[in-house]
UniProtKB/Swiss-Prot annotation:
Similarity comment: Belongs to the universal ribosomal protein uL4 family.
Positions with biased composition (Basic residues): 60-71
UniProt xrefs under InterPro entries: Ribosomal_uL4, Ribosomal_uL4-like, Ribosomal_uL4_dom_sf
Keywords assigned by UniProt, alphabetized: Ribonucleoprotein, Ribosomal protein, RNA-binding, rRNA-binding
Record carries keyword Nucleotide-binding: no
Species: Lactobacillus gasseri (strain ATCC 33323 / DSM 20243 / BCRC 14619 / CIP 102991 / JCM 1131 / KCTC 3163 / NCIMB 11718 / NCTC 13722 / AM63)
Stretch list, region Disordered: 45-97
Role summary: One of the primary rRNA binding proteins, this protein initially binds near the 5'-end of the 23S rRNA. It is important during the early stages of 50S assembly. It makes multiple contacts with different domains of the 23S rRNA in the assembled 50S subunit and ribosome.
PANTHER family found in the cross-reference section: 50S RIBOSOMAL PROTEIN L4, LARGE RIBOSOMAL SUBUNIT PROTEIN UL4M
Protein name in the entry: Large ribosomal subunit protein uL4
Length: 205
């Protein structure tokens, strides 16, 4: 069972915590993580791109010239694909890019990412993370005290913390139920509180 140090908001040690081995100590499954990333990014696509085919282009109802006797190739409509201003063949149409993924696979992907963070020593645990008011300076000081640098993903339900992180470059604050595979992979450091760990273990256990 992984045992990590807990840090308070001033950067001092506040004890240790035992992490669930089945969540924070498994062998990461890269293929499942890859599938989860593809699924999440695909779900964000609008899927609204569209072009007009020959039936949607205005006009072209009349046959340009008679079928036989002109010496020219037969044509049925000036909106056929081979004409300038004609419709498009096999063009994009509105569609949904959402992909299905079993719940067990989605949870395995999240467990794999969390386990990799522990293995890489990129998981930082705070005893708590609260601010009395939205103060970017105070949140930056807390991260500096914890010796956190680079791209940082902070998991907190505190509204003041979420607002304080908006002006910090390379820092993103998400609620506990907003923790996802794409952000966890994209940001090098992951900052969790003890309460966040308990809720994560309740969901993924």
């Amino acid at each position: 069972m992984a045992n990590l140090e807990i840090i308070d908001q001033k950067g001092k040690s506040a004890g240790n915590v035992d992490l669930n081995e089945e969540i924070f100590g498994i062998e990461p499954n890269e293929s499942v993580v890859f599938d989860a990333i593809i699924r999440q990014r695909a779900g964000k696509r609008q899927g609204t791109s569209a072009v007009k085919n020959r039936s949607a282009v205005r006009g072209g109802g009349k046959k340009p010239w008679r079928q036989k006797g002109t010496g020219r190739a037969r044509q049925g409509s000036i909106r056929a694909p081979q004409w300038r201003g004609g419709g498009t063949v096999f063009g994009p149409t509105p569609r949904s890019y959402k992909m299905d993924m079993p719940r067990k696979a989605r949870r395995l992907a999240m467990k794999s990412v969390l386990s990799q963070k522990v293995a890489d020593k990129d998981l930082i645990i705070l005893d708590q993370l609260t601010l009395e008011a939205p103060k970017t300076k105070e949140l930056k000081a807390i991260l500096d005290n914890a010796n956190v640098s680079g791209k940082v993903l902070v998991v907190s339900d505190d509204k003041n913390v979420q607002l304080s992180g908006k002006n910090l470059p390379k820092v993103k604050v998400v609620p506990v139920n907003g923790l996802n595979v794409v952000d966890a992979v994209d940001y090098q450091k992951l900052v969790l509180t003890q309460d966040a760990i308990k809720r994560i273990e309740e969901v993924l256990a």
